[in-house]
Amino acid sequence: MSKVLYIKANIKNEGESRTFKVSDSFVEEYKKNNPEDQIITLDLYKENIDFLRADDLGKLFGPKDEESKNNSILKYAYQFADADKYIIAAPMWNLSFPAILKAYIDYVSVSGITFKYTAEGPVGLLNNKKAVHIVSRGGGYDNSPYEMGDRYLRTILGFFGIKDIETIDIDNLDVIGVNVKEKVKEGIEKAISLAKKF
């Protein structure tokens, strides 16, 4: 049985988010194909996540023991490390993704939990895991230097040791004349197809 962490980063209501229409379809199909797996949904806007402050740094760099697992910051890093698979649903905002997702990444990027420092440099601790990033964008950003969200996620996940990463992108949703419903439908079809083998 795998443990799947479904990370949602969008302030929009469930029915309004084009990203979530695709990611929720992915999750539903995944459940059909993996009924024994545990899916933990983490809606970042409903969590007590904020930008790190000075007193938070002591928690991040403090001891990693049983007591620290209940820490208000470190609990997210332990939860992240405990998962086998990750579904990250976040729209493109200003060439990247919502700031709350970066704040969350700062919570989970913890030496001794998701990576470690060695004499040869940092080493990821989350090997043999996989992730999918589901993103909707207003314009077309395939192979564009302006696309920094997916690129960053691939880099930081790779830093943690996660190398098996897929992206489902739904582009051009705000371009005049584009059939948005059809675009979202295509994204859902891609999601269902990938979920069957994720």
Swiss-Prot record:
Residues reported to bind FMN: M92, W93, N94, L95, S136, R137, G138, G139
Catalytic activity reported: 2 a quinone + NADH + H(+) = 2 a 1,4-benzosemiquinone + NAD(+); N,N-dimethyl-1,4-phenylenediamine + anthranilate + 2 NAD(+) = 2-(4-dimethylaminophenyl)diazenylbenzoate + 2 NADH + 2 H(+)
UniProt cross-references to InterPro entries, sorted A to Z: Flavodoxin_fold, Flavoprotein-like_sf, FMN-dep_NADH:Q_OxRdtase_AzoR1, NADH:quinone_OxRdtase_FMN_depd
Highest taxon, organism lineage: Bacteria
TM regions (residue ranges): none
Cofactor note as given: Binds 1 FMN per subunit.
One Gene Ontology molecular-function label: electron transfer activity
EC number, UniProt record: 1.6.5.-, 1.7.1.17
Keywords: Flavoprotein, FMN, NAD, Oxidoreductase
Cofactor: FMN
UniProt cross-references to Pfam families, sorted A to Z: Flavodoxin_2
HAMAP family xref list: Azoreductase_type1 (MF_01216)
Full protein name: FMN-dependent NADH:quinone oxidoreductase
